[in-house]
Structure formats: structure tokens, C-alpha cells
Amino acid sequence: MSTAAADPAAAADAAVTRKERRRERKKERRRRARREAAEAARKAAEALAADPEEERRLRELEEAEADASERARRAFEDAERRWLEAAAARAAEKAAAAREESTAPEDSSREYKDDHGNGTEEDDEWEYVEDGPAEIIWEGNEITVKKKMVKVPKKAKENQPIQQDKAHCPFHLKTGACRFGVRCSRVHFYPDKSCTLLMRNMYSGPGLALEQDEGLECTDEEIEQSYEEFYEDVHTEFLKFGELVNFKVCRNGSLHLRGNVYVHYKSLDSALIAYSSMNGRYFAGKQITCEFVAVTRWKVAICGEYMRSRFKTCSRGIACNFIHCFRNPGGDYEWADWDNPPPRYWIRKMAALFGPSDDSIYGKPSDTPHLERSQSSDRRRPRSSDPRYTPSRTRDEDAHKQHSSRDYSHSKHERSSHTEHRRDRKESSASDKHRHREIKDKTSKYSSNMESERESHKYMREEKHRIDHGNGGKGDHGKVRSRKNRSERQESLEPGSSGRSSDFIDQDTTESPSGSKSTGRHHKKTRRQSLEEHSTRRSSRHRDMEDDGRGQSVAVKRKDHHDTSDDRWVATNSDVDSDLETQYQRSSSEGSKLGMKYHARSDSETGYGRSRSGTTKSRRERKRQSGNGERSDTLEVTSDSDTRDMSSDAWRSRSRSSDENLSTHRSRRKRSRSSHDS
């Protein structure tokens, strides 16, 4: 049993022994190979060292390296020497130039004293400046510039105590507030009374965020609307006490400027009244504390970079110690930010509120930079002479559409005269509309009859004339009519003939030309006489009614319209006469009954179309005149002779004659058809 246990242990020891022996053999082989390689390398090195050629080559390499290093050292030394020489030369030149510059003023002053004598006092009061552009002279490759100098008195330097005063705090003098407060090492000046009032931390609306994340809670429109409401309330209240020069609200994030309200009055009395009235009052749940500050120069109080960026930002951010103000609605008091006088429209507006001012505070020129003005800054203000100015944003927007921003106030007498004039025009226009309605009612019963009678009568007259010419001038019994009889019959059928008096018709008949004269000349003479008589009656009526005022002038216009309608009828008659002569020549050249019938039918259709177009034109003219009468300011009821001519009796007689002519025309047409069929 013990022998079996000892056999595995011996076998394990034998296995370990074999591995170790194999590992030892490998190590020995490696050591032998390394020793052999080292021995071979030593022998090769000894062989090379013993070779004379190899020794010579190594010596040559060492000598070449030594020569190269020597050349590099010599080149460096030469360059260093040259640089030192150049530096010494430059230093010598600079020293010489400095000596010349130091001696030049002494030489020039000595020469000037020799030329002008001992005028030291005059030299202190005068200086030499350039007069005009310099003269440039080209001489080959050289350019010579000559400047003309003139002697002028020296300008007095402006005293700037704010920058030169080291005792007083500059920020407190400029803005009336200092971030150090009572801990400031410089003097803070608090005046007993001043034209400028300061209300600290009065505005607490949006736009005063200390952290940038708080600005995300309100949009720019909400901030602008909130400040506009604050401006309307506070500015209106402070404007009650007197004229303002500037009104500013700070939007800085610093505690000493945050929400400060500055009110700069033009007069000291107004500032004192505002102080006594506003100090201790409550606004938005907080008590107002007013104090006087010596801030009168707003150009140095407001941040210039902030103003140039159009109320956007500056490089110092909200922690800037200069004023970052809200932009007033409508761009109010922007001129005061640059210490400039207000525009003329603002002066007129303040004069309307507080009366004209004799103070010359605005007598200095403007130095406002030309900045791009936004559209919203041009807000219009309504005209107002109320001593208690109460602005409203709604009224300003309405006034923006009606009035100019430079035209605000007129006197009370001028406005009252405009009001009375508008009232008179309204009353006259109402009375004139009533009169026009009465005229329209009186004349409406004739319009339909006139239109129908004119159309039917004109068509019948043209048909009658064409039939007469188509039959070669024959009458009812086949007799040939003379030109005189035909012209008389045409006169009896003209629409204007019924409106004439009996003596006028007799005169035309007695003065009618003989058969040898043409019908056109006879009609021209009668038309000329009728036109002269109508113009004489129209001018006489116009002179009688000329002095009756505005309503009478409109009545004359209506009567002239009736006269022009008569003239239009006369022009239509001349057209008919020309058509009759042309058609008579055409029918004579044809010579056949069929041709005459064809031409009569076509001409009748043409005449009917012309009469329809003339009737449509007259209807449009009457409609236009009636529309103009409704839009006119004044209308007067007048008795017109032309209206009396359109009475019912006249139209009844004309319709009776037209019926007789129509029956005659039908009988002739039947006879012509029967003769043609045969």
C-alpha cells in the first residue's frame, strides 16, 4: 500500500526533473550562440583595426568634420561683427538726429525773435493755422507740399470742472447717484433747490431684470407697453406743474440707478411746486420721495454708447454707472438727451399749454448726431389748447392719421370759425337736399312721357322723310312737292318747333327761302335765329338770378342744362337734313322701285339705330345731371320756361299730330306695296 503511494510521487518528481533538464539545455545553447557571435565580432573588429586602409578612412572623416566646424565658427563670428558695426552706426545716427531735434527749436525761436523782435506776449495770444488746402508740387520723382499758414488768435480752452475737479464725485455730479453712496471718498453735492427732481426707484415694472434669465419672462412688446402706461400716468402728472425740459426713467440694473425717474423743469418755480405737490404721495403702493439734483447736462449723464446703439446695450451691460434710459413713447425729449433745443412743433405745443416763453434757454445750435430715426418715433399729437394736458395713446394714434407732427395748435378763434363754417355747410346742405327732392318730385311725372314721345316722334319723322324722298318728292296724291313745302313740313315735324311761340313760327315761314335755295341753308338760318334767341333769354335770366347767392347759381346751372338739351335737339335735326340729302341723291341714281325700297328699309333701320343711340345718350346725360344735382351742396327751386313748354297740353297736341302722320305713313306703304306687286 505504501509502495503504491510512493510511485506517483516519484513519477511526478521524475517529470519535473525532465522539464528542468530540457529548459537548462535550451539556455545553455543560447549562451553558447551568444558567445560565439561575440567572439566573431571581436575578431572582425581586430581585423579592421589592423587594416591600414580602414585607419586612413577614419582619419579622413575626422579631419572633414573638424574643418566644417571651423568654417561654421568663422562665419558666425563675421556675422556677429557686422551686426555690431551696423548697430553702432544706427545708434550714432539716432544720437545725431536727437541732437539736431533738440537744437532746432532753439534755432527757430532765435530766428523768429530776430525777425519779429521781443513779442512774447503777442505770441501767447496768436497761433498759426493752415489756410486752405496744401499746394502739391511735382519735381521729377520728388513731391513738395507747401502749406499756407495764417495767424489767428488762440481759442480759449473750455473749462471742464467735472473732469478737472478731483474733490467732487464725477458720477454724482453727472447722474445725481453714486454706487458707493455715503461710503464714497469724494464729496457729493446736494443742492437746496434745483430745476431737476429725482425720484429713486420709482419705476418697478418689467425691463429692470438683474439676471438675464428674468428677461425671458417678458417680451420687448410687454416691456414697452408697461413703460408706456407708466409714462402716460407719471408724465401727465408732472406736466401739470410746468413745462418740462426732459423726462427720463433709468433701466439700469445697478441699485443706485435702478428705476430712477428724472424730471427736468424749464423753470425753478415749476420744480418747487412739483416738489411740494409730489413729495410724500403714493404711486403703485409706494411712497414717492423727491430730491433735488444738479443734473442739467444730459449728454454727459446718459451713456453715449447706449444712445449710439439706439437704446440697445453698451459694453458695460446693466452695471454701467451712466444712465440707461427707457425710450419715451413717440420719441419725446430725445433732443434733450443731446442738450439740444426742442423742435418747433414741440415749442408750439408747449406755448399752447403754458403760453409763450421769453426764456432763451433754447438759443444754442444743435449737435445731435444723424442717427436713423425709427418709424414709431414720429408720433403725431392732436391740436390742443387745454391748459391741463392729458395725453392719451388712443388720441395720439387717431391724430397720427389726421394731423402733421409739426402742426399742433391754433387759436380758439380760428377753430371756432372752422366749426361755424362746417355747421353752416351742414345746414345748407340739408335744406338744399330738401329742395332738390321737391324739384325731383315735380319733374318726375314728365320724364317718362318725354322719353317715349321723343323716341316715337323722331322715328316717325325720319320714316316720313325717307318715304317722301323715296317717292321722288310726291305727296299723298302722287304730286311732286317743292323743296319749300318739304322744308316747311320738316319744320312742323321737328320736336323743337312745338316749343316755339306762334309769332316765331310765322317769322320762320315768311322768311323761308324760295324753291331755288337749298333746304340746308334755310334750316341753318332758322337754327341760328333760334339759338340767338335762346342764348339771349338764358343770359338775361342768368343776370337776373346772379345775385341770389349760391343756391341761385346752381339753379342757373340746371336751366343751362335744359338749354343745352335744346341745342342737342337742333344738332340732331342738322344730321337728319344731311342724311335726307344724301339719301335723295342715292335714290335718284338708283331709279328703280326695288332699289328705292331696299335703300329706304336700310336707311330706316340706320335712322332707328341712331335715334336709339341718341335717346340712350340723352338718358345718360339726364342721369348724370341728376346725380350731380344730388351731390351738389345747394339747389334752388326755379321756374323754367323750358319746363312749361313740356306741359301736358303741348305733348297731347304733339301725340295727336304724330298719330295722324303715322296713319298717313301706313296708307302710303300699302299703296307702294300694291304697285310693286303689280
Curated annotation (Swiss-Prot):
Keywords: DNA-binding, Metal-binding, Repeat, RNA-binding, Zinc, Zinc-finger
PROSITE patterns, per database record: RRM, ZF_C3H1
Molecular function terms, GO-annotated: DNA binding; pre-mRNA 3'-splice site binding; zinc ion binding
Biased composition (Basic residues): 19-34, 519-528, 665-678
Biased composition (Low complexity): 1-15, 605-616
Polar residues compositional bias, start-end: 571-591
GO CC, one annotated term: spliceosomal complex
Pfam families with a match to the protein in the record: RRM_1, zf-CCCH
CDD domains: RRM_U2AFBPL
Basic and acidic residues bias spans: 35-45, 68-77, 93-119, 367-386, 393-444, 451-492, 529-550
C3H1-type zinc-finger residues: 163-191, 297-327
InterPro entries to which the protein is assigned, alphabetical: Nucleotide-bd_a/b_plait_sf, RBD_domain_sf, RRM_dom, RRM_dom_euk, U2AF_small, Znf_CCCH
Stretches the record annotates as Disordered: 1-77, 93-128, 358-678
Residues annotated as domain RRM: 195-295
A Gene Ontology BP annotation from the UniProt entry: mRNA splicing, via spliceosome
Protein known as: Zinc finger CCCH domain-containing protein 16
Organism (species): Oryza sativa subsp. japonica
Taxonomy of the source species: Eukaryota, Viridiplantae, Streptophyta, Embryophyta, Tracheophyta
